[in-house]
Amino acid sequence: MKIFREVFELGNKEIILETGGMARQADGSVTVSCGNNIVLVTTVVKKSVADGTDFFPLSVHYLEKTYAAGKIPGGFLRREGRPSEEQILISRLIDRSIRPSFPDGFFNEIQIVATVLSYDGAFSPDILALIGASASLAISGAPYDDVVAGVRVGYTNGKYILNPNKQDLRDSDLDLVVSGTDDAILMVESEANSLPESVMLGGILYAHKHLKTIINSINRLAKVASKPRMEYSIYQINKFLKSQIKSQFFGEIKNAYTIASKQERNLKLNAIRKNVLEYIFSSDVDGNEYTEKEILEAFHDIEKDLVRSNILEGKPRIDGRCTETIRPINVKIGVLPGVHGSALFTRGETQALVVTTLGSDRDAQLVESLDGIEKCRYMLHYNFPPYSVGECGMVGMAPKRREIGHANLAKRATQAVFPNEEAYPYVVRVVSEILESNGSSSMATVCGSSLSMMDAGVPIAEPVAGIAMGLIKDGAKYAVLSDILGDEDHLGDMDFKVAGTRYGVTALQMDIKIKGISREILEQALEQARVGRLHILGIMNEVIKEHKEAVSDVAPQIHVMNINPAKIKDVVGRGGATVKGIVEKTGAQIDTSDSGEVKVFAKDKKSMDMAVAMIEEIVAEVEEGQVYKGKIVKLLDSGVFVNLLGSQDGYLPFSEIEQAGMKTNSLVEGQGLEVLVQNIDRGGRVKLSLVAR
């Protein structure tokens, strides 16, 4: 067994790449170690293309094993189940980073599995998994020429931090992951605290500068441990077939792409496709027999060339806009009367109905990870039904990876403005229903989430808007597009989503289909996005620019009380009897903590006020010199104990009763008396006198 090893430093941390010791039957197998973190990443490449495959079937699976953190999984089976949302998001991050590095037309299936074997809690293993995926590909024999690496960057007190640990990130205004090759940036994922575009750009360039060390180390490992380059074929469009279709139908295709409406344009294009198929099948074009798939792919290539060349030549985009114009926007709030908050955000042919629901602590999501169980107070879910694009499909299934990814992006974009628990004790769930989609549905979700939460009375710090930027690039010529359509995303070279407030960026997500982009393009895209974002915020602010002061009449009420911690036992009562009685009488939900915090959550204000009043009565402190109406709770030889407030009793001597002209032999338990608190000694004992009738 021959083991090869490479060691390099990243942010003053030693990282070790090793191959030859584990999973040797995989085409590529690398362990990546940093401290006590170890991730095993394997790559398997199919040696032939499956019949009918017309895409690149790359799949990435990031898996966390609970034994890595010395834990046993929860649940009845006590074993790992389906991957968590966080694991799916990391799988997507790796996929998006490495996918652009494969040649166009390479359709062999590749499966990458990254397994966390050991975890120390200091660092997230995601960057190690990304580095390991690139390294395992580099030694697998797959056509992976442009080696990719990735790093995480933080930003604290005006300084960038390379490879920050989890504690660093808690204090950081930025959580940025950048991946790329030696000379190009391929993928960006970030969450930020309303940082200026200049800081975001600086972070991206700072990250890219540090990729070279990792790439060099991977290349050295591949030089000594790589398998021979596999034999493979590249699928190519038949140029003669393409020219024949173009000569006969280009005018019709060109006219179709002047139709602004997506539905009308698609109807026209479908009719042209039908005519193209009939023409090719009924004529002997070049003596060859072509499949429907080959014909439609050639047709699609003509569409792609047309749209791209029009934009690069300065002609109007598909819907008639110039490169910087934003589609018409319509904003409505409070569209659903029975919910706590709602907004309908429409931008061109993309529409999101976003609904906010308020809940109590008990509604918080409990998320299990290698770090333990975390309580999530803010949830955002994104649904993309097939009717949103005029199609039939599966409905009511578990969310797909894309839906999970879009929800996470929208949540990250709005997380920076979401109030902390001390300022706002509600748990919040936001759901985005995409009703129509023609590009930028995730950014419509960002805008709709901001509007919906403000409608629900959630005190977000600032409204947030998002915009998707695109890129068409051919050699040195390029055009950056604001607010891209679905076709521009599909036919273009970049999908760059930017979200933020009027002050700065809260989230970035960039995916590149070409071999990377330059600083100049990034700068232009960020500036164009800033202008577009401010335009969108201006329209949103005309409808609502700050949160409503009160929650909806149909929303639950919540009240937080801070009482003397010693009084918590009085609120709870023996065996919980007191608090159960309050809950039964009022219908409220009551949560207490040893710190003295009491949360009252009720379906309406009446129930809440009743519960609060009952608790206040229990915890109220008796004061000297005050008169109280109490009841006798115990008779003694020398006096009586009178209950004043809650569990607080006072002692009333017979001498005080007789002095007030009342006979002591007539007293009974449960009898009401009006008494004055004479004094309270250091031990908390209360002495009473009877108020004369």
Curated annotation (Swiss-Prot):
Keyword flag 4Fe-4S: no
Keywords (A to Z) from UniProt: Cytoplasm, Magnesium, Metal-binding, Nucleotidyltransferase, RNA-binding, Transferase
A GO cellular-component term linked to this record: cytosol
SMART domains: KH, S1
Cofactor(s) the protein needs: Mg(2+)
Listed InterPro entries: ExoRNase_PH_dom1, ExoRNase_PH_dom2, ExoRNase_PH_dom2_sf, KH_dom, KH_dom_type_1, KH_dom_type_1_sf, NA-bd_OB-fold, PNPase
Catalytic activity: RNA(n+1) + phosphate = RNA(n) + a ribonucleoside 5'-diphosphate
Domain KH as annotated: residue spans: 556-615
Domain S1 motif as annotated: residue spans: 625-693
EC number: 2.7.7.8
Subcellular location(s) of the protein: Cytoplasm
Residues that coordinate or bind Mg(2+): D489, D495
Predominant location: cytoplasm
GO biological process, one term: mRNA catabolic process
GO terms of molecular function: 3'-5'-RNA exonuclease activity; magnesium ion binding; polyribonucleotide nucleotidyltransferase activity; RNA binding
Enzyme class: transferase
Cystine residue pairs: none
Stored NCBIfam families: polynuc_phos, PRK11824.1
Entry's family note: Belongs to the polyribonucleotide nucleotidyltransferase family.
Subunit structure: Component of the RNA degradosome, which is a multiprotein complex involved in RNA processing and mRNA degradation.
General function of this protein: Involved in mRNA degradation. Catalyzes the phosphorolysis of single-stranded polyribonucleotides processively in the 3'- to 5'-direction.
Protein name, as recorded: Polyribonucleotide nucleotidyltransferase
